[in-house]
Regions:
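Adenosine-cofactor binding site in Rossmann-like domains, unifying the SAM/SAH pocket
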Residues: 21-43
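Conserved C-terminal active-site "lid" loop/helix of NAD(P)H-dependent oxidoreductases
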Residues: 214-220, 232-281
Length: 281
């Protein structure tokens, strides 16, 4: 199986590479392939002739997007469309990564694939438009929505909390945002499994570590009582972009793939932190 991976230098892209080790993988980071350049994308896809294009590239600075709307839409919407259209031209399938932030957070229970998106921020609107461009491209397309990603590569909430704990508490964390923390390694393994299935039974899946928690609860689990964590409100955090208050995801469609469900978020976090501990000894 031949795979073109866009966004190979990001935190998910870097964990996808070992997960896809058994394939003929062609990874491109943003320096090697600017997905906003339609001509460059077409040339890369024509050269590789992949069975699958995986788009893990994104402009994911949620607050920064409020002041860089053109750039956010260029990457998250137009760039995704460029990859999907190029995939369609060579008969490749495309798997595109999206976000829980396409929802407005008013449901109050986990969102499934059948719930209607209502994005609140520039970032969220750009990601939702990217979904629509991919699904409307004519390619055999699959959108995976995930949430609150963390891994050892790149910047993420877990690494930020660990760094804050090293400096000493208290750490102030929002308690009125609830979501589904997801380890990039678990998501990468799920993606590797999905593209090996004969035909994904749905064009849209929610793929997250099971369960939900607030940012405050997540931070407390990360530090394990080593430093104090204090709850604050989203308003007190002073963030530019609006965020959904409750964006936990669940999947009504993943079981039909026959692939295992991802572990609970607590289990994934314990495994992640134990790997850090082992690396230090």
């Amino acid at each position: 199986m031949v795979i073109l991976l866009a966004g190979a230098g990001g935190q998910l892209g870097r964990d996808l590479q070992p997960a896809l080790a058994g394939t003929d993988l062609h990874p491109f980071d943003h320096r090697q392939l600017d997905i906003t350049d339609a001509g460059a994308v077409e040339a890369a896809v024509e050269r590789v002739r992949p069975d699958w294009v995986i788009n893990a590239a994104a402009f994911n600075d949620v607050d920064g997007a409020e002041q860089a709307e053109d750039q956010a839409f260029a990457v998250n919407a137009a760039g995704a469309g460029n990859l999907a259209e190029a995939a369609a031209r060579v008969g490749a399938a495309i798997l595109h990564i999206s976000t829980d932030y396409v929802f407005d957070g008013t449901k109050g229970s986990p969102y499934t694939e059948d719930d209607e998106p209502n994005p609140l921020s520039v970032y969220a609107r750009s990601k939702y438009e990217g979904e629509q461009r991919v699904l409307g491209s004519g390619a055999s397309a699959c959108v995976l929505r995930t949430a609150w990603l963390y891994g050892w590569q790149g910047k993420n909430f877990v690494k930020a909390i660990l760094a804050a704990a090293e400096r000493g508490g208290p750490i102030r964390v929002v308690a009125d945002q609830v979501g589904s923390p997801t380890a990039t390694r678990d998501l990468a393994e799920a993606i590797a499994g999905l593209i090996q299935t004969p035909h994904p039974q749905s064009p849209l899946f929610h793929v997250v570590n099971a369960g939900a928690c607030s940012r405050f609860e997540f931070a407390r689990a990360i530090v394990g009582g080593r430093v104090a964590v204090e709850p604050i409100t989203t308003e007190q955090s002073g963030r530019l972009a609006r965020r959904p208050a409750y964006s936990a995801l669940s999947s009504s469609r993943w079981p039909a793939t026959g692939l295992p469900a991802l572990s609970g978020w607590e289990t994934a976090l314990v495994r992640f932190l134990s790997e850090k501990q082992a690396a230090q000894h």
